[in-house]
Amino acid sequence: MKSKIFAILLLFAFVFTSCNGYGTKLKYQKTEVYYTSKVDKKEAEKLGDFLVSSGFADDNEKSVQLSKNEDSGNYEFRMVTTKEAAESETYVTIFKIFSQQISDSVFNKSPVDFHVCDNTFKTLKVIPFEARNDSLQ
Protein backbone atom coordinates (compact mmCIF):
# COMPACT_ATOMS: atom_id res chain seq x y z
CA MET A 1 0.00 0.00 0.00
CA LYS A 2 2.79 2.42 0.90
CA SER A 3 4.53 1.75 -2.41
CA LYS A 4 1.32 2.56 -4.33
CA ILE A 5 0.91 5.84 -2.46
CA PHE A 6 4.57 6.69 -3.04
CA ALA A 7 4.22 5.91 -6.77
CA ILE A 8 1.13 8.11 -7.03
CA LEU A 9 2.84 10.97 -5.20
CA LEU A 10 5.92 10.62 -7.39
CA LEU A 11 3.79 10.67 -10.54
CA PHE A 12 1.87 13.71 -9.27
CA ALA A 13 5.12 15.55 -8.50
CA PHE A 14 6.47 14.78 -11.97
CA VAL A 15 3.29 15.94 -13.70
CA PHE A 16 3.07 19.05 -11.53
CA THR A 17 6.65 20.13 -12.20
CA SER A 18 6.37 19.35 -15.92
CA CYS A 19 3.27 21.49 -16.39
CA ASN A 20 4.80 24.95 -16.39
CA GLY A 21 2.76 26.14 -19.36
CA TYR A 22 5.86 26.94 -21.41
CA GLY A 23 5.76 23.73 -23.44
CA THR A 24 8.11 20.80 -23.65
CA LYS A 25 11.69 21.54 -22.59
CA LEU A 26 14.89 20.59 -24.37
CA LYS A 27 18.33 21.56 -23.06
CA TYR A 28 21.29 22.72 -25.15
CA GLN A 29 24.26 23.43 -22.92
CA LYS A 30 22.75 25.93 -20.44
CA THR A 31 20.01 27.10 -22.81
CA GLU A 32 16.47 25.88 -22.22
CA VAL A 33 14.50 25.51 -25.45
CA TYR A 34 10.78 25.14 -24.85
CA TYR A 35 8.42 24.33 -27.69
CA THR A 36 4.65 24.48 -27.79
CA SER A 37 2.20 22.06 -29.36
CA LYS A 38 2.05 24.37 -32.40
CA VAL A 39 5.46 23.11 -33.57
CA ASP A 40 6.96 19.65 -33.56
CA LYS A 41 9.96 18.29 -31.71
CA LYS A 42 12.11 18.06 -34.86
CA GLU A 43 11.68 21.80 -35.48
CA ALA A 44 12.67 22.55 -31.88
CA GLU A 45 15.69 20.24 -32.11
CA LYS A 46 16.79 21.90 -35.34
CA LEU A 47 16.52 25.29 -33.60
CA GLY A 48 18.50 23.97 -30.62
CA ASP A 49 21.25 22.66 -32.89
CA PHE A 50 21.41 26.06 -34.60
CA LEU A 51 21.63 27.84 -31.24
CA VAL A 52 24.66 25.70 -30.39
CA SER A 53 26.39 26.10 -33.77
CA SER A 54 25.79 29.87 -33.77
CA GLY A 55 27.31 30.25 -30.31
CA PHE A 56 24.03 31.43 -28.75
CA ALA A 57 23.79 28.35 -26.53
CA ASP A 58 26.82 28.47 -24.27
CA ASP A 59 27.72 28.43 -20.57
CA ASN A 60 25.27 31.25 -19.75
CA GLU A 61 21.74 30.36 -18.71
CA LYS A 62 19.11 31.37 -21.26
CA SER A 63 15.50 30.43 -21.94
CA VAL A 64 13.77 30.54 -25.30
CA GLN A 65 10.49 29.23 -26.60
CA LEU A 66 9.49 28.19 -30.11
CA SER A 67 5.89 28.49 -31.18
CA LYS A 68 3.89 29.34 -34.27
CA ASN A 69 1.25 32.01 -34.81
CA GLU A 70 -1.91 30.29 -35.99
CA ASP A 71 -3.17 33.37 -37.85
CA SER A 72 -0.04 34.43 -39.75
CA GLY A 73 1.71 31.05 -39.87
CA ASN A 74 4.92 32.77 -38.73
CA TYR A 75 7.23 31.02 -36.33
CA GLU A 76 7.68 32.80 -33.01
CA PHE A 77 11.13 32.83 -31.43
CA ARG A 78 10.46 33.96 -27.87
CA MET A 79 13.41 34.92 -25.69
CA VAL A 80 13.52 35.84 -22.02
CA THR A 81 15.41 39.09 -21.62
CA THR A 82 15.05 42.49 -19.97
CA LYS A 83 12.62 45.32 -20.54
CA GLU A 84 15.63 47.50 -21.35
CA ALA A 85 16.57 45.19 -24.23
CA ALA A 86 13.04 45.50 -25.59
CA GLU A 87 13.40 49.29 -25.64
CA SER A 88 16.93 49.44 -27.07
CA GLU A 89 17.23 50.15 -30.80
CA THR A 90 20.59 48.39 -30.81
CA TYR A 91 19.07 45.21 -29.41
CA VAL A 92 16.08 45.46 -31.76
CA THR A 93 18.50 45.54 -34.70
CA ILE A 94 20.37 42.52 -33.31
CA PHE A 95 17.09 40.64 -32.77
CA LYS A 96 16.01 41.36 -36.37
CA ILE A 97 19.29 39.98 -37.69
CA PHE A 98 19.04 36.91 -35.45
CA SER A 99 15.46 36.14 -36.54
CA GLN A 100 16.61 36.39 -40.17
CA GLN A 101 19.42 33.92 -39.43
CA ILE A 102 16.96 31.53 -37.78
CA SER A 103 14.63 31.86 -40.77
CA ASP A 104 17.43 31.12 -43.24
CA SER A 105 19.26 28.40 -41.29
CA VAL A 106 16.45 26.57 -39.49
CA PHE A 107 13.10 27.12 -41.18
CA ASN A 108 13.90 27.27 -44.91
CA LYS A 109 13.33 31.04 -45.06
CA SER A 110 9.92 30.86 -43.35
CA PRO A 111 9.14 34.07 -41.39
CA VAL A 112 10.25 34.19 -37.75
CA ASP A 113 8.86 36.92 -35.49
CA PHE A 114 11.07 37.74 -32.49
CA HIS A 115 9.26 38.11 -29.15
CA VAL A 116 11.15 39.84 -26.35
CA CYS A 117 9.70 38.27 -23.18
CA ASP A 118 9.86 38.51 -19.42
CA ASN A 119 10.85 35.50 -17.32
CA THR A 120 7.37 33.96 -17.68
CA PHE A 121 7.41 34.27 -21.49
CA LYS A 122 4.97 37.17 -21.39
CA THR A 123 5.66 39.21 -24.53
CA LEU A 124 7.13 42.65 -23.85
CA LYS A 125 7.67 43.51 -27.51
CA VAL A 126 7.17 41.81 -30.87
CA ILE A 127 9.73 42.45 -33.57
CA PRO A 128 7.96 41.38 -36.77
CA PHE A 129 9.90 39.47 -39.38
CA GLU A 130 11.20 41.60 -42.23
CA ALA A 131 11.99 39.60 -45.35
CA ARG A 132 15.37 40.42 -46.77
CA ASN A 133 15.55 41.26 -50.45
CA ASP A 134 18.17 38.75 -51.65
CA SER A 135 18.55 40.55 -54.97
CA LEU A 136 20.21 43.45 -53.13
CA GLN A 137 22.97 41.29 -51.67
Map each language-model feature to its residues:
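C-terminal motif of bacterial Sec signal peptides marking the signal peptidase cleavage site
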Residues: 15-18
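Short, non-transmembrane amphipathic alpha-helical segments
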Residues: 47-49, 56-58, 86-109
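Post-signal peptide N-terminal segment of mature Sec-exported envelope proteins
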Residues: 28-46
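Solvent-exposed coil/turn segments that connect beta secondary-structure elements
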Residues: 80-84, 117-119
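Positively charged n-region of N-terminal signal peptides that target proteins for export
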Residues: 1-5, 10
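Short edge beta-strands and adjacent turn/loop segments
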Residues: 25-27, 54-81
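Bacterial signal peptide processing site
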Residues: 20-22
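A short amphipathic beta-strand at an alpha->beta junction
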Residues: 102-128
